[in-house]
């Protein structure tokens, strides 16, 4: 939720911000219309309350002097009726105005490219040594800043589906039969690799000052509304029938809501929290995309970074959590690029977002594996998370970033570390798996 005082004094800024994001500016217009009604009613209420006080004093004086106060009493009754009517109107206007506030997006940071479409995200850097099938060289160069750091493959690597089935580490048919599309069984050494990824990420973040939590996998409506953009996530979230509960799409939502309506002490900031959880997504808006395999699924495990900090520190923390994610993928040896997400693709909460996109040689393209966002005070206002200072109470800033979404990284490893009919385990994970290869037999 945006700062009402900031909005009132910067109407044009917020209308322009809607244009930057490619969303309707009608909510801003509606807010100012309702806010003027709210101010007008408040002015009338203040006048009526003053009038009531004057009439009440007259009544007291008349009674004291044995005078007739019937006219004044009738006037007070009429004033009370009018006050009650206006207070009811004011409450309805406040509710509608506050509802509209939830729909006005966060201000885009000045460093965000103002444009639309993922294809216009701004390349920040490319890192790594890629394996590129000869037919995909131009695609790779175009999206890596014309990097020459690659080796040419004469044959396209196997898809993770074909490789997983050949090695008996993925079962999609059984999952589809008992659960439907976009579900899966991960088996044998691939499951051990997934567990190794999780343990590696947890150790990595623990060494960098993050506390580790496993949050609730369900949130009530109030918490979910405060933590995320329900309108954007309406095609993503699973609602529990007959309950005021939603399955989480990411542990970010639970961690953010964990401190809702709380006051923090300035000395305790920043708070770095890493959440490990299953995530559940309907993917209703992804019809026809990635229908085979485990890249885009209804259920997956994820390690999430989350930071509560002081406003003046949040932009440094955005670079920190992005750097943490990059360090993980560099250590794994997965080639990737970082993009500065353009204004039209940010979502309502983020003031700025970076994506990390890994190179997938079997698919011949970069695909998103990490999103790192600074939501400034927008999410904290929605959840009412403040900290105490010597100069008064302030809202914290909140930031989040994927560390590892396991199914997508499994696919990245399967495509980038194929060696014939086997998969080589990245060196940093061997101490966690206890083996160097996934192979037949």
UniProtKB/Swiss-Prot annotation:
<dbReference type="InterPro" id="IPR042103">
    <property type="entry name" value="SerRS_1_N_sf"/>
</dbReference>
<keyword id="KW-0030">Aminoacyl-tRNA synthetase</keyword>
<protein>
    <recommendedName>
        <fullName>Serine--tRNA ligase</fullName>
        <ecNumber>6.1.1.11</ecNumber>
    </recommendedName>
</protein>
<keyword id="KW-0648">Protein biosynthesis</keyword>
<dbReference type="GO" id="GO:0006434">
    <property type="term" value="P:seryl-tRNA aminoacylation"/>
</dbReference>
<comment type="function">
    <text>Catalyzes the attachment of serine to tRNA(Ser). Is also able to aminoacylate tRNA(Sec) with serine, to form the misacylated tRNA L-seryl-tRNA(Sec), which will be further converted into selenocysteinyl-tRNA(Sec).</text>
</comment>
<dbReference type="InterPro" id="IPR002314">
    <property type="entry name" value="aa-tRNA-synt_IIb"/>
</dbReference>
<feature type="binding site">
    <location>
        <position position="297"/>
    </location>
    <ligand>
        <name>ATP</name>
    </ligand>
</feature>
<keyword id="KW-0547">Nucleotide-binding</keyword>
<dbReference type="InterPro" id="IPR002317">
    <property type="entry name" value="Ser-tRNA-ligase_type_1"/>
</dbReference>
<dbReference type="GO" id="GO:0005737">
    <property type="term" value="C:cytoplasm"/>
</dbReference>
<dbReference type="Pfam" id="PF02403">
    <property type="entry name" value="Seryl_tRNA_N"/>
</dbReference>
<feature type="binding site">
    <location>
        <begin position="250"/>
        <end position="252"/>
    </location>
    <ligand>
        <name>L-serine</name>
    </ligand>
</feature>
<comment type="similarity">
    <text>Belongs to the class-II aminoacyl-tRNA synthetase family. Type-1 seryl-tRNA synthetase subfamily.</text>
</comment>
<dbReference type="GO" id="GO:0004828">
    <property type="term" value="F:serine-tRNA ligase activity"/>
</dbReference>
<keyword id="KW-0067">ATP-binding</keyword>
<feature type="binding site">
    <location>
        <begin position="368"/>
        <end position="371"/>
    </location>
    <ligand>
        <name>ATP</name>
    </ligand>
</feature>
<dbReference type="GO" id="GO:0016260">
    <property type="term" value="P:selenocysteine biosynthetic process"/>
</dbReference>
<dbReference type="GO" id="GO:0005524">
    <property type="term" value="F:ATP binding"/>
</dbReference>
<feature type="binding site">
    <location>
        <begin position="281"/>
        <end position="283"/>
    </location>
    <ligand>
        <name>ATP</name>
    </ligand>
</feature>
<keyword id="KW-0963">Cytoplasm</keyword>
<dbReference type="InterPro" id="IPR010978">
    <property type="entry name" value="tRNA-bd_arm"/>
</dbReference>
<feature type="binding site">
    <location>
        <position position="304"/>
    </location>
    <ligand>
        <name>L-serine</name>
    </ligand>
</feature>
<feature type="binding site">
    <location>
        <position position="402"/>
    </location>
    <ligand>
        <name>L-serine</name>
    </ligand>
</feature>
<comment type="pathway">
    <text>Aminoacyl-tRNA biosynthesis; selenocysteinyl-tRNA(Sec) biosynthesis; L-seryl-tRNA(Sec) from L-serine and tRNA(Sec): step 1/1.</text>
</comment>
<dbReference type="InterPro" id="IPR033729">
    <property type="entry name" value="SerRS_core"/>
</dbReference>
<dbReference type="InterPro" id="IPR006195">
    <property type="entry name" value="aa-tRNA-synth_II"/>
</dbReference>
<dbReference type="InterPro" id="IPR015866">
    <property type="entry name" value="Ser-tRNA-synth_1_N"/>
</dbReference>
<keyword id="KW-0436">Ligase</keyword>
<dbReference type="InterPro" id="IPR045864">
    <property type="entry name" value="aa-tRNA-synth_II/BPL/LPL"/>
</dbReference>
<dbReference type="Pfam" id="PF00587">
    <property type="entry name" value="tRNA-synt_2b"/>
</dbReference>
<comment type="subunit">
    <text>Homodimer. The tRNA molecule binds across the dimer.</text>
</comment>
